[in-house]
């Protein structure tokens, strides 16, 4: 789980503290690179008391739908929940030609697969949330290539938010 998180987070290069939309788009680009195909994220309202995310694997790309009413940091958690399902699906299953693969709807929150996906989504949310909450003027705000950039990324991974003034 941590290896996948590292594989998705390591390529992300955004100014920290990050604009939530910029971080979200950078994560989507990283997921697309990891998948080796485009991942299109759509925002839509889900009916109350139902799912907050959905993944459809198409012939040439993936569609992920996240609840538009969720805060962006929560949309990151939802997206990463769906990414975990992408990671766990057997790669050798052929898709019906011209149609999306069958959708596995969550029927039981206690299913081990759903708990793993939730755990991964929360892990990613925790690790990336610190990129949003970092105060300006810390090492996290260094430009890519700046020697402080590495220190900032380490600090972000450890949830370090700088000294209080």
Language-model segments: which ranges?
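Active-site hotspot residues in diverse enzymes, especially metal/ion-binding acidic/histidine motifs
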Residues: 1-165
